[in-house]
């Protein structure tokens, strides 16, 4: 079904088609990967002045709560394209040179799409296996506690006469930074200020998940703890902003697990018809809203494995039966018949995503391991 959607989207000449893709060069150059785009009719629109490009590679994802009928909301995105310093706008760490990409656009989205409190879940390192996976878009520590959002005339909030700092629209400031051992996550409490308004943003960086893979061992339980922890800082109707590198593989897997575990906790998954497959249904619904969500079979299998394990625990918690007993095994298999056979989901290799060609110099590493650009004055 995904191949059919992508083929239809590529061939569609009508932007009203549900899976149409925009061909504008300004849109294409804002994608980190050539083959991962947001559908034209299911994407976040930046609030910019009329005539300016409002594209950001971010898709609103809504999955229905089967009990209440209300939508669980997320935003799947990617951060920081491999652009040079002359491309539109960027963030400046205090006393540091500019970093790569449309980072101010990302923070604008966080500001406008979040409610009173923003929640960001980051499932990638900035560098993995020697490759840049994500731009450094947030303050790392107290030595670089603030990042400036540079003003641009395309901003709807831009008011040159009201600027207290020339050329500065806002800033991201680190208030607290901790490491949660249970969820194996770096947790940062940030203040995002744009214009005269500000809000708190919680940022979770999970380090236990390499690209194209699945968490193993204790990292698996840590991911489940992160799902609960990030949910506790938000509400179902306040979209958690989730990203990895491309915003489809690890991102889609996280969102699917969050939704399905909520469905399990409510009891809905324990009352399904034997032929029902909630994992397939959820992934298919996500792929209708953003291409390639849950990128490979290994990640698909991982969702089945986790849901099977958590269903076992749920049944044990409810009935008090022994999971290792023969009767317990029969009851378990009857309840989760569609979740208990990984044979159809053996991992197979898929090609790596193709990055947009770098239009700037190859970045060097800073003290923190994040990329730096040469001084533009010397170019």
State each model region's role.
Residues 1-379:
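Cys-based phosphatases of the PTP/DUSP/CDC25 superfamily and their flanking regulatory architecture
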């Amino acid at each position: 079904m995904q191949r059919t959607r992508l083929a239809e989207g590529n061939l569609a000449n009508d932007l009203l088609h549900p899976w149409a893709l925009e061909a504008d060069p300004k849109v294409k150059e804002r994608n980190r990967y050539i083959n991962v785009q947001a559908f034209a009719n299911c994407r976040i629109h930046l609030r910019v002045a009329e005539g300016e490009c409002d594209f950001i590679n971010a898709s609103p994802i809504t999955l229905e709560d089967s009990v209440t009928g209300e939508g669980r909301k997320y935003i799947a995105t990617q951060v920081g394209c491999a652009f040079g310093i002359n491309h539109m706008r960027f963030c400046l760490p205090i006393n540091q040179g500019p970093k790569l990409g449309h980072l101010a656009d990302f923070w604008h989205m966080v500001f406008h799409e979040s409610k009173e409190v923003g929640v960001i879940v980051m499932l990638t390192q900035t560098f993995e296996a020697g490759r840049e996976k994500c731009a450094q878009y947030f303050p790392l520590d107290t030595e670089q506690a603030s990042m400036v959002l540079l003003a641009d005339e395309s901003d709807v909030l831009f008011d040159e006469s009201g600027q207290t700092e020339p050329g500065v629209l806002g800033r991201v400031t680190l208030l607290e930074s901790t490491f949660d051992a249970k969820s194996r996550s770096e947790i940062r409490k940030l203040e995002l200020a744009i214009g005269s308004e500000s809000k708190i943003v919680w940022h979770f960086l999970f380090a236990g998940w390499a690209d194209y893979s699945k968490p193993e061992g204790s990292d698996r339980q840590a991911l489940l703890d992160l799902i609960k922890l990030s949910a506790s800082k938000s509400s179902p109707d306040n979209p958690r902003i989730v990203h990895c590198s491309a915003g489809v593989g690890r991102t889609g897997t996280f969102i699917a697990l969050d939704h399905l575990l909520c469905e399990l906790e409510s009891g809905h998954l324990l009352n399904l018809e034997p032929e029902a497959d909630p994992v397939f249904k959820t992934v298919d619904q996500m792929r209708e809203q953003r291409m390639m969500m849950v990128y490979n079979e290994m990640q698909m299998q991982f969702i089945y494995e986790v849901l099977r394990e958590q269903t076992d625990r749920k049944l044990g918690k409810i009935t008090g039966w022994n999971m290792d007993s023969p009767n317990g095994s029969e009851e378990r298999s009857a309840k989760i018949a569609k979740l208990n056979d990984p044979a159809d989901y053996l991992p197979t290799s898929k090609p790596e995503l193709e990055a947009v060609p770098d239009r700037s110099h190859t970045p060097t590493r800073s003290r923190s391991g994040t990329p730096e650009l040469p001084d533009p004055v010397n170019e």
